[in-house]
Amino acid sequence: MMIAYTMTSRRGDTDLLLSEVADRLQGQGVKICGTVQINTERADSHRCDMDVRVLPDGPVIRISQSLGKEARGCRLDPNALETAVVQAKSALLQGAEVLIINKFGKHEAGGRGFRDLIAEAMMLDVRVLVGTNE
């Protein structure tokens, strides 16, 4: 059982790093599963759209929701996140060697999100790489 985490100091850098790691591993023939995050800047907002690409080969799922210009709350769409979890679990059960998760955040800390998938991967002796915030 092996679990590792990574974090960077600049916004979006962890997402880019994990995406690059996923691409390199896949290019080397390693069976990967999980998600990497894609942030897309919006002209009409100071906040970006957040999507995740389900590994190894899609789909891309929008995990952020627009709450309006003045909204200050969490923009994560929990239903979209759970859809990504289900898709990632399917790939895990097809014999993945490495699970990559874009972020261990509030949902995981609260027992939701990718938490159970991380535990399942560890029980299956699948290596886990997780992005975290500073």
Map each language-model feature to its residues:
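Glycine-rich P-loop/Walker A and Walker A-like loops and their local beta1-loop-alpha1 context
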Residues: 1-32
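Short amphipathic alpha-helical segments and helix-helix/interface helices
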Residues: 18, 22, 115-122
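N-terminal phosphate/diphosphate-binding loop that engages ATP/GTP or pyrophosphate donors
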Residues: 22-68
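Helix-adjacent hinge/juxtasegments
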Residues: 55-94
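Structural motif
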Residues: 97-98
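Walker B catalytic acidic pair
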Residues: 103
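Conserved ATPase-coupling elements of RecA-like P-loop NTPase cores
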Residues: 107-114
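Sensor-1/coupling segment of RecA-like P-loop NTPase cores
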Residues: 120-134
